[in-house]
Amino acid sequence: MHHRGRQLRRTMLAVVLGGLVLGWSVPAGAQTRESSPSVSTETSVSQLSPLAEPRPEPQDQLLTPSEPTPRGGVPLLRRFVPGLADFMKELPPFLRDTSVNLHLRSFYFNRLNSDESQNEAWAFGGWLEYRSGWLLDTFRIGGVGYTSQPLYAPEDSPGTNLLHPPQDPILTLGQLYAQFRYKEYALVTGYRQLVDEGYVNLHDTRMVPFTYEGVTIKGELGRFGYNVGYLTALKQRQEETFHDIAGVAGARGSDAGLILTRLSAEPIKGLDLYGANYYIKDVYNTAYANVEFKHEIVKDLSLQIGVQFTDQRSVGDHLVGDFSTLSFGTRGGFLWRGLTAGAAIYTTDSGAALKTPFGSWPGYLSFQEKDFDRAGENAWGVGAKYDFGAGSLLPFNIPGLTVLLRYATGTDARNTGATHGALPRVTEGDLDITWNIPWVKGLQLRFRNAYVDDGGRDVPVKAFRIILNYDIPVL
């Protein structure tokens, strides 16, 4: 890491540590009280800081499912340690509203590739999260340690990204941050943090999510939301250490960071507008826009349509090559008595495939194994999801259970190398079953299965994942 990056990290770390000292010295009545951590604090925090953005939630996007992990119940220590809850009420707010959360995850991954090689591992781990209360209703700190430990990891079948390559454990301090806020207008976060903004996101599809080093400021100004940031480094899901943003993008030797800008709005009920830009000096720029509209036609029947557009091109010294590409996608669907169904189409310019080194592709046709975003590719997909808990189409209910089926195919893709040859047709079918077990709050079981015909290959790709999440509030 270059000198400038090291100095920035030291400054942000000093701010985090300084907050610990200040937190002890402020009296208990010095700020507006948050909700007691004996109940979920997410609601109270979102009312005072811009944590909820006016853009589509992933689980509402039919063809890009991301089922939320349920939150756990009352914190264990406050429930079972006599007098602890009452004692903490008398502490300064910085300590009184402290939360500690343990998230356990078990993940089994098995994929048979078209060349008959195999990727297989079973890992156990998760993360431990600390978050302070607000000091003077303005400042707080937090940190998250992540781990992934191999339970079964054959040496001859690496490549799952559950573990550090080839099959080694992961132990890392993925988040360590300080935050300043002013009402809902501004929330400044410095140092190691989560970022979830279109092409820069968590990519939380294995044991450990992507986390970033940098500074961001986001907020809400009336109907508008914004986020502006400068990100210097990224820790990928299979890594323990952070690497320069430009290096992750392929520009080795460059210390350029990523400038993130986002503007979103909800001008009328049901209409969500989202636009973002991601710029890396001398590497490339990505501009992304997403419009979603959801409208209830009659009771229990809603229609939903969406449009996405991406412009991506090299800039400056073209450190990763001179290229430009565009992509466009649209989708439509309906929600009726617990059933969600619809279709999407996507087309990508022949200039280049989309580059997505900072997370998963946010497109409608991002599937379990394949992203249908190759150069020149034209793709379409259909899907249906049913909520067995809230749905009323069937004569029975299974609380917490959702099932998703989806199918997509992509054609006309081309190699952008010297040959410019045609690439084979790709088809994928997915089954995704998620069960938020109702009698154990915070416990989720998920099964994901994919079948991929990679065009012209004798052996299809077969992959399945078994995932267990258990969220346990500790304090």
Q: Language model features by range: what are they?
A:
Residues 104-108, 188-202, 226-228, 232, ...:
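Transmembrane beta-strand segments that form the barrel wall of outer-membrane beta-barrel proteins
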Residues 33, 77, 81-100, 131-142, ...:
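Short loop/turn motifs that connect adjacent beta-strands in outer-membrane beta-barrel proteins
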Residues 227-258, 300-375, 379, 449-464:
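Outer-membrane beta-barrel translocator/channel fold
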Residues 261, 382, 406, 435, ...:
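Outer-membrane beta-barrel "beta-signal"
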Residues 96, 120-124, 170-174, 209-213, ...:
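Residues that define the transmembrane beta-barrel architecture of outer-membrane proteins
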Residues 2-125, 129-136, 337-340:
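N-terminal periplasmic/intermembrane-space "pro-region" immediately following the signal or transit peptide
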Residues 114-120, 182, 202-209, 233-236, ...:
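Solvent-exposed loop/turn segments connecting transmembrane beta-strands
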Residues 130-243, 263-271, 339, 343-351:
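Outer membrane beta-barrel
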